[in-house]
Curated annotation (Swiss-Prot):
Protein's recorded name: Methyl-CpG-binding domain protein 2
Domain MBD: 145-213
Annotated Gly residues bias: 98-121
Species of origin: Homo sapiens (Human)
Role according to the record: Binds CpG islands in promoters where the DNA is methylated at position 5 of cytosine within CpG dinucleotides. Binds hemimethylated DNA as well. Recruits histone deacetylases and DNA methyltransferases to chromatin. Acts as a component of the histone deacetylase NuRD complex which participates in the remodeling of chromatin. Acts as a transcriptional repressor and plays a role in gene silencing. Functions as a scaffold protein, targeting GATAD2A and GATAD2B to chromatin to promote repression. May enhance the activation of some unmethylated cAMP-responsive promoters.
Bias (Polar residues): 229-241
Region (Required for interaction with DHX9 and PRMT5): 1-149
Keywords, ordered alphabetically: Chromosome, DNA-binding, Nucleus, Phosphoprotein, Transcription, Transcription regulation
Encoding gene per record: MBD2
Cell location: Nucleus; Chromosome
Residue spans of biased composition, Basic residues class: 77-95
A Gene Ontology cellular-component term: heterochromatin
Amino acid sequence: MRAHPGGGRCCPEQEEGESAAGGSGAGGDSAIEQGGQGSALAPSPVSGVRREGARGGGRGRGRWKQAGRGGGVCGRGRGRGRGRGRGRGRGRGRGRPPSGGSGLGGDGGGCGGGGSGGGGAPRREPVPFPSGSAGPGPRGPRATESGKRMDCPALPPGWKKEEVIRKSGLSAGKSDVYYFSPSGKKFRSKPQLARYLGNTVDLSSFDFRTGKMMPSKLQKNKQRLRNDPLNQNKGKPDLNTTLPIRQTASIFKQPVTKVTNHPSNKVKSDPQRMNEQPRQLFWEKRLQGLSASDVTEQIIKTMELPKGLQGVGPGSNDETLLSAVASALHTSSAPITGQVSAAVEKNPAVWLNTSQPLCKAFIVTDEDIRKQEERVQQVRKKLEEALMADILSRAADTEEMDIEMDSGDEA
């Protein structure tokens, strides 16, 4: 290494045609690496590495890219250039200044003079990016503000929900919702949740953004399935006895031969039964053992049924029969005849008529009607007497109050 007249030190082994900072000359492939506050110039024997200081520089052209932490710039290029400048700095390198040029090298500091060389296309010095910035190239990471993880009651215990608000970009102010499993796995969408949970949790009415079960979504899904013509065709029995048409690729409709062992049998259809909703038979038996009471919590005595009404079937008594007859009177407009078939005593499970109460068949005679009319007249007469007694008692109370008020005024 030899000293430079300007006070700097230059590394040996620098080939001709390579220039240092502040100098000029014809250069080959060169790379510039810019430092923070100072620099040292040290071209390599082959490619010519030059480190440029705060002030001073050269001209050339080439490609550049951002270096590491110091915010410097390095690149490679070919060209000729000239420049004048001064620089101070410290660095390490190997190099040798060209004839007639001057510069800094090694790990010393100093000033460089000027040199001359052939002109060429100017080289732009890229502006270094500040430390910690996103740098050139594709868009940097989006700034977000993390929210607090909260428990999600709609999911199994241990699941957390987090809402993250975007702080930059065109979508600033919007939020993203994430869910975390008890093991810490992150989920970004509802399909991911459904695949992970499987059949353990029904997510058909789950709202991913609010984290709650929405019954309105479930009703919409049911209504959509109900209105779907494909689902309407499922589950309906086909009782049509007409011969079907062969469904083949032929453009002509060909009949199908129907083969049966009982050609005389006919299928009977009951349209009323098809429209009837399923219900529980003899639901009035659930009222067995229950009794009504008045305002004084006294049990009201049940009414007595006529002697002609007798229960039928296992576990039948007067209370159950009374409930069955009352429910039939209020819920059905058909006449009540009881179990007409005599075979119901032998096998009630087969011959029982579910539209009639569990009582034997009975016949209402004229004598029964006359007795019922007499009972109704007696009850009405008792009611009339009770109402008259109440009216008289109210009138007597009013008259006594008037007399007391008159005596008070005279006094």
